[in-house]
Amino acid sequence: MRKSRSLFTDAKPRRTGALVYPMLLILLLAVIIALNFVNNGRVKLLNEDVTITSLSKDLEKFRILHISDLHGNEYGANQSTISTMLKTARYNAVCITGDVCAPDGSYDAFLKLIDVFAGRVPVYFVAGDEDPAPIAAQTGAPERVKADYVLAAEQHGAIYLDSPQKLTVGKSAVWFCPESMYGLDIASSRTAYQARRAALINQAQNAPDQAAQLQVIDYQLSVLDKIEAAIKEMQDSDVQVALTHHPLTETTIKTLQQWSGNEDSAFLRSVSLVLAGHYCGGQVRVPFVGALKAPASANLAGWFPQDNLIQGLSTIQGVTQYISPGLGVSDAYPIPLRMFNTPSITILTLTSVLKF
């Protein structure tokens, strides 16, 4: 006997899953986005040991605070997130490896970052590819060759690294050097600048940018003199730390190592540590895997690049390089945000102790 069907019973069961699953997915995405937003407001302090077997006792446990790719970001009022985190940290010098300005060229956040350290430890910095040119002819003010943000940073106590700077520790020394000086043929560069200077002087005196160009050339000649003097002063026992924005590739390192300039030239093989940035840790990272993609401008461009070539410590052709995960967001990536990638700064501790 067939059961009668109630007039009030639906012919088909409701498919509640068709609504629940999309809602759960939307909720999950909202939670991830919210957590990522909070995470990007934090700053993580990393610690790395760098082994230099010939390190002197004076430099054992010498610490360098490495910061990169600020991109004009401010973490708390007056960079209070960073200053609070570092309140009990110990370090002997601060190295900033470029991309310090905001996309619009403003640099207030950079100056506030310098103020966290200035007067306590030396602060060295180089410019990045997304910063305004640090040195350029100023037609309206020919006596100036440095960009406004460089001059302002120097007024706040930082040191623009256009030539080697010596930091003496006991009877030992650490030299902080611009990477651009390695492989530089000083004699040839000086000859080229002097020829250019002579050509400008022989031009008509009413050239509007003549004075500005001459000022830049004189500045570059003075930089060559300072590099040359520093190279002559450097001892084999000194530690050389090279600052660069773009990480050095294996090809670049091989080329610089093969450099056979005159005795007054600097050699990359004398460098104990290279500090770099630029990649922002890949910007978007896959948990437990690494960077999702390298920027198109990188030699290792592509999906899931080798992670120690994007961030962290590595040794290439005998050269130790540390690439900072950075703080901000680079225009080199199509997605303008950090994902699963906490903004980070690093304290690198020099040691003679081998670790296995």
Set out the residue ranges of the language-model regions:
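Beta-strand-turn-beta hairpins that frame and shape the catalytic cleft
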Residues: 51-65, 164-178, 192-202, 232-241, ...
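Core catalytic region of metal-dependent phosphoesterases/phosphodiesterases
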Residues: 79-169, 267
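N-terminal Lys/Arg-rich, disordered targeting/topogenic segments
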Residues: 1-17
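Conserved beta-sheet core of the metallophosphoesterase superfamily
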Residues: 248-343
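N-terminal active-site segment of His-dependent metallophosphoesterases
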Residues: 28-113
